[in-house]
């Protein structure tokens, strides 16, 4: 699971995003680009992505070929016979491409095992969508409690314990921490 999550959230995601912005006109408005620049700490340049679209499509194809090979043993889902977080992590990348960048869909369709797996995930469904505002979403998150029992790790190298204030940020391209 963890290794596949690293692949889906970094390598596959970056290939998918590059294809989306490299093959789709007008998807990113000025506010979105500024938000991404703040997140990544570097300029967001859709024109460069468009210029690199052919190479980016090859990168996506290579990742999908690898996924296709993984599924070639006829397993139903990525980790075996049951769905899991790995399937969700991989699927959202393909859904993102299909929803926004039809040019990328053609590459997905060439991978027969991926297409069959994708159909099995689609058959599960997406649940019921509900629009939430930022404040409402934050209130729900604040009111949520964990099902995991609190514990202190005696080997925690920084002496952190439940209730301590921490900053959380991405460990890849994201640069804006959340306190």
Protein language model features and the residues they cover:
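GST-like domain detector, emphasizing the conserved glutathione-binding G-site
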Residues: 1-36, 154-162, 166-179
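GST-like fold's C-terminal all-alpha helical module
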Residues: 8-123
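Intrinsically disordered, low-complexity segments enriched in polar/charged residues with Gly/Pro
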Residues: 63, 144-145, 168-170
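Histidine- and/or cysteine-centered catalytic micro-motif in compact active-site loops
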Residues: 82, 93, 134-138, 146, ...
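Mixed-charge, Lys/Arg-rich low-complexity intrinsically disordered regions
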Residues: 130-162
């Amino acid at each position: 699971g963890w290794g596949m999550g690293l692949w889906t959230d970094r390598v596959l995601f970056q290939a998918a995003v590059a294809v989306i912005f490299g093959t789709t006109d007008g998807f990113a408005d000025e506010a979105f680009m500024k938000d991404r620049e703040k997140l990544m700490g570097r300029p967001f340049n859709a024109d460069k992505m468009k210029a690199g679209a052919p190479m980016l499509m090859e990168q996506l194809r290579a990742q999908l070929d690898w996924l296709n090979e993984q599924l070639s043993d006829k397993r139903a889902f990525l980790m075996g016979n049951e769905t899991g977080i790995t399937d969700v992590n991989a699927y959202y990348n393909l859904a993102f491409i299909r929803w926004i960048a039809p040019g990328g869909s053609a590459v997905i369709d060439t991978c027969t095992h991926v297409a069959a797996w994708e159909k099995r995930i689609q058959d599960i469904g997406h649940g019921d969508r509900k629009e939430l505002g930022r404040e409402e979403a934050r209130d729900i998150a604040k009111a949520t409690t964990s099902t995991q029992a609190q514990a202190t790790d005696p080997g925690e190298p920084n002496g952190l314990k439940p209730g301590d204030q921490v900053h959380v940020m991405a460990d890849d391209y994201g640069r804006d921490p959340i306190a």
